[in-house]
Structure formats: C-alpha cells, structure tokens
C-alpha cells in the first residue's frame, strides 16, 4: 500500500508544518492590531506650511507593516517611518491597497527624493536613492498637487527641528 505510506508521510509533514503556518497567520493578524502613535509634522514648501497628521512607524514590526491593508488615507494624513539614523532604505507596496507618494527625508528634515504614485500591491522595490533618516508616505499624487519637491523642509521631532 504505497498510498497508505504516502498518507502517513503527508500526515506527519502536515502535523509538523501546522504550527509554523499558524504562527505565520498569527503574525499577519498581529500586524492588523498594531496601534501606531499619532504625531503631527509640518512641511515647508513654497512659502507655505502644510500640517499632516501621521502614524509613526518606529520599530521593525511597525515599519514592516506600514500602511498595508489600509483602504484610505485622509488628504493630510500619512505615515512617518523613523530609521533613527541616515541609511539607504527600500520600500515595496506588497499588501498596500492605495497608491502612495514616498517622501525620503534626510536627518535634518530636508526632502531628498520623492517617489510618486507607487503602484498598489507591487513587489517592485523603491529605493531611497540617498541615505535617509525618515520616509513619509502620503496619498499618491499629493506631493505633486501640493508642490512638494526635493529641498523642501519637514519639521518634526525626529529631525530635531520641531
């Protein structure tokens, strides 16, 4: 009975694999329960100050979850990722349901690079192009609409200028 032996081997494999599958599912579910701290930042551009309410992603779990599974963002809302020191970073849009602009910010709060309209659900990597301290994600197309550009300043406590 080759089939019976196969069934036993398959049953053992499933028995040993089940805890890992459950753990992976629990980790994904845990991400849905993350309570991000809220903060306010200001972007200085073209003689204006634009105020944003942001969720803070300050640890590996928060940064890896980011805006995944969100269905919407308000017009002046976003997420600020803090990497604590300047470094090259890359993002992707896996499990992210809305287009985003990614604003890459130096340690002094200067916008270094803007990636516009990142494609929802894409697994293509989006590099910072420069070492950065933080990344601000806002609604796709907002950076252009608001006239944001490299060289503009972001004021927030993590940049020491708020």
Predicted regions and their residues:
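N-terminal secretory signal peptides
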Residues: 1-10, 14, 18-24
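Compact, glycine-rich, soluble single-domain proteins
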Residues: 30-162
């Amino acid at each position: 009975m080759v089939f019976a032996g196969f069934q036993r081997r398959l049953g053992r494999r499933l028995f040993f694999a089940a805890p890992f599958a459950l753990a992976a599912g629990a980790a994904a579910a845990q991400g849905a329960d993350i309570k991000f701290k809220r903060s306010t930042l200001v972007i200085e551009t073209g003689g204006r100050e634009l105020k944003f309410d942001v969720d803070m992603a300050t640890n590996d779990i928060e940064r890896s979850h980011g805006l995944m599974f969100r269905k919407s963002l308000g017009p002046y809302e976003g997420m600020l990722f803090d990497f604590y020191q300047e470094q090259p970073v890359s993002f992707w849009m896996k499990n992210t349901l809305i287009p985003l602009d990614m604003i890459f910010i130096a340690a002094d709060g200067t916008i270094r690079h803007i990636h516009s309209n990142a494609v929802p659900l894409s697994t293509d990597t989006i590099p910072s192009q420069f070492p950065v301290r933080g990344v601000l994600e806002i609604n796709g197309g907002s950076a252009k609409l608001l006239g944001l550009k490299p060289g503009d300043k972001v004021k927030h406590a993590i940049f020491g200028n708020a």
